[in-house]
A protein has these predicted regions:
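Loop-to-transmembrane alpha-helix entry segments
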Residues: 56-60, 90-93, 109-129, 138-145
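Residue-level signature of transmembrane alpha-helical cores of multipass secondary-active transporters
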Residues: 8-9, 61-65, 90, 120, ...
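Membrane-interface helix-cap regions at the ends of transmembrane helices
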Residues: 18, 22-25, 29, 42-57, ...
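Specific alpha-helical transmembrane segments that line the substrate/conduction pathway
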Residues: 34-44, 77-111, 116-120
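Transmembrane alpha-helical segments that form core, pore/gating elements
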Residues: 44-47, 100-101, 106, 137-198
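Residue-level hotspots within the lipid-embedded alpha helices of multi-pass solute transporters
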Residues: 13, 65-70, 94, 148-156, ...
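Specific transmembrane alpha-helical segments of multi-pass solute transporters/efflux pumps
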Residues: 14-15, 19-23, 48-93, 101-103, ...
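Hydrophobic transmembrane alpha-helices of multi-pass small-molecule transport proteins
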Residues: 41, 47, 64, 102-103, ...
Length: 199
């Protein structure tokens, strides 16, 4: 791998990690669902000025936006609000990879390889260890942990929608898909914030 590619990969890792720190800081200033809604508001509208709507069925675009954008981040922001450590949340959220493998096998009939089964087994053991730590009071709130897992599952569902979208005849550009899908969760976030966070 070229040095440039390694540096770009490292930049992505750093940006991903800082994302959780920023969420943690932001939650000190405003409720989780409102913060998440504003995040997508700031992403969506500038993007709409530069990219056309992807030519895919609206049901797929809605499914993608409501899972990978709304579901994932609604649960994640609430998890951190309820005490889930930001660093641990970034790790637990990666359970999406194993949820994606399982969903892919069930929906697309993808065959599970031995190394994937071993990975899933190790992930389950890791989850059980974290649950045990939560139950014994080692500063891992059970509610925050379960909400993070729910976020990971929604991310996995979004991956399934993404695969269906990319199999469509008019395969959209990634930037168009990300930009327009960011528009979808704004209203759900604001409505849920009004209901759960209060006016």
């Amino acid at each position: 791998m070229a040095r440039k590619d390694v540096l770009l990969a490292m930049l992505v890792v750093v940006a991903w990690g800082l994302n959780f720190v920023v969420i943690k800081v932001g939650l000190h200033a405003m409720p989780p669902l409102m913060l998440a809604g504003l995040r997508f508001l700031l992403v969506a509208f500038p993007a709409l000025l530069f990219v056309a709507r992807p030519k895919v069925p609206m049901r797929l675009l809605l499914g993608y936006g409501l899972t990978i954008s709304f579901g994932q981040f609604a649960f994640l922001f609430c998890a951190i609000k309820f005490g889930m450590p930001a660093g641990l949340a970034s790790l637990v959220l990666q359970a999406q990879a194993f949820f994606t493998i399982i969903l892919g096998a069930g929906i697309f009939g993808e065959r599970l390889q031995v190394k994937q089964l071993v990975g899933i087994a190790l992930a389950v053991v890791g989850v059980l260890v974290l649950i045990e730590a939560s139950l014994t009071g080692q500063h891992i709130p059970m509610l925050g942990f379960m909400l993070t897992l729910a976020g990971a599952f929604n991310w996995a569902c979004g991956n399934i929608f993404n695969k269906k979208i990319m199999q469509h005849s008019s395969r959209p550009a990634v930037m168009a898909l990300v930009g327009w899908s960011a528009l979808i969760p704004i209203v759900p976030f604001m409505v849920c914030s009004l209901i759960f966070d209060g006016p």
